[in-house]
Amino acid sequence: MLLRQIYDADLSQYAYRMPEPRQLTIDEVIGQLDDPTLVVLDTRADRAAFMKAHLRGSLYAPAKGSFSDFAGSYLGPDERIVLVVDSADQVEEQVRRLIRIGFDKIEGWLGVAALASANGTLASIRSVKFREVPALIAEDPDTLVLDVRGTAEYEARHIRGALSVAHTRL
């Protein structure tokens, strides 16, 4: 019961005023990318754009749909959060959703347009079609195939030798 009271008291600090994280510059964020307590949570809607160019080490949790599920799976209780958003009008809603699931260490936010000046700190993710995998493995037998689907999907059908780890567990 005491733990519940402490939790409720902790949440009540936001009962009247939601935190308002400030807009950060790209240089402020880049300067902290190597800090293990900082997580960049990229909330933009366009998954293909995220895969093409995102800040090194950032996690993708699109603002729509299962944002809270993804964020709750990816984030640790002591991590500081920087949001990457499509537009400034999304910040308040994403902050509210993070607060509701217990994450209040929101350092600030960055508009997706700022990534254009993130020289040298952008990463990309190559998407591979299922039919391309055998050729990749033949080319390099040490290729690790990581199947990030849910357990039921993996058990129904998967590539021999693939390691199954749901994306929410990475």
Regions found by a protein language model. Name each.
Residues M1-M18, D46-L144, V148-L170:
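Rhodanese-like catalytic fold shared by cysteine-dependent sulfurtransferases
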Residues M18-V29:
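A contiguous, basic/glycine-rich beta-loop/short-helix subdomain that forms a polymer-engagement track
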Residues E28-P36, A135-D140:
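A short acidic-Thr-Gly-centered motif at the start of a beta-strand
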Residues P36-T37, D78:
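A short, charged/proline- and glycine-enriched loop
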